[in-house]
Every structure is written in C-alpha cells, then in structure tokens.
Amino acid sequence: IPLGGSSIEIYVSTIGYPNATSCTVDATLQRKIGSSWVDCKTWSATSPSSHRELVDMDIYYTVPNGTYRVFSTHSVTDSGITEYEYMFSDVVTISS
C-alpha cells in the first residue's frame, strides 16, 4: 500500500488453528526491472510462544520510484503437519 512520497506499508498476517504449534510468514518486496521481478528485501516473523496460532507483520519501508509488489509465504504447523500458502499483493507504482 503506498503511503505517499516514497514510503510503503507492508502488512501480512497468518491465522492458523487453535492447536497450531507455530505460524510463520515471510514477505519479500519485489521491484519490477524490465520484464522481471527482482527481490529487494525479505522480512520474516514467527508467532510468539504465548499465541502460536497467529502472526502479524506490519512494516514501513522507504523505496525509490518504481513498480513494486510483495510475495508472501504463510505457514502453519499443527499436529506435525505444515501447510503453506503463497500470495502476491497488488502491484503499486511509486513516483514523486
């Protein structure tokens, strides 16, 4: 989500099951260079031990002008089985 100027907000979350033993989320900011998407930076978060079924990540980041998206990997482990989900955000263009 563009915030104005050259700042963006990246928010990702994962909600698992009540008996989940862990939830994790990775968010990778990607910039479009020509016809390719190039990884810029990756952030990771893991659920706290007191609340294993939920993880949130809210990041504010300054970027140069360009076209961006976020690729996120969400995982939840329950009863020894880990499920994964992969998502792309909308594409945003930052220009001053």
Predicted ranges, named:
Residues 1-96:
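Mature extracytoplasmic or otherwise solvent-exposed domains
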